[in-house]
Amino acid sequence: MTNALTVGSRREKRRTAAAAARRRARSARPPWEEPPTAVGQAAKGLTLGGTLAVILVPLWIIVLTSFSTPGAINRAGGLVLWPDGLTTETYRQMLSDPTVVTALGVSLGITLVGTALSMAVSILCAYGLSRPRSLGHRFVLLLLIVTMFISGGLIPSFLVVTGLGGYDQYWALILPSAVSVFNILVLRAFYQETSAELIDAARMDGAGDWRILWSVVLPTSRAVTAVTALFYAVGYWNSFFNVMLYMPTDSQKWPLQYVLLTYVNRANGLPGSVNSGFGETHAQTAPLSLQMAVVVLTLVPLVIVYPFVQKHLRTGVLTGAIKG
């Protein structure tokens, strides 16, 4: 009997000690590491569900409206929430216009060439500024930072580009926005955190700066490089303001964004439309379906490219924000 009481007492003491240890562990953890309560889990689910709805519902409406007939759009009151009278007429008419096909090729060319040029300049500049013994790197860095807060202005930029013969030339759509100081600073911050042991080992093996950049720095910075390239590519793909400044007359040189903007203006009865075959036939389609088709057409390339860089996006953004 005494042995049974002793064993039971020991078990109770162990339970009490374990409970006290759990309480101490919980009290030592920060609040954000505490297991969520039922109310917290419900609030998290509602927040995530609401955020997802805010993102997906507009996309759903845009896609359905772009495929809807004028009657379906009128019955829905302007924006289609459920499939009704779907048609691809708007897309057929838009893609049958040679202006759109040419503009798509122009946009792809500008995006590819511009992104390659911007990445080359940004990587070289960031690597040079990241080396502490680079000649004049502090002065160059100061000049770059100043340009983030003080710009020359629209009219001086226009006069410089046109004075260099850039009016109605493709390079005028690339060079004025070829370099982003923010992207250079992000790359520089990452390059500064590259292992000094790796660089020293490469120098001992006889590698110069070009070899170190190509064989050591770039392979260890794929994430931030992919994110920076994505930022540049999206900027070139969505750009249309420079077209309004430097290439406003020749529609055969317009990129896709500006051509589609003129189609939206035509659908709304605004001036500045493209003089092409699409203009005479689009009256058979709903203007709103045309505008939604414009949005879908401009999103498709980004949706195709994003999965290839998605795995690097989170790592690259956080790395550029934390390091340095």
Feature map (PLM): residue ranges:
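A hydrophobic, multi-pass inner-membrane permease signature
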Residues: 2-324
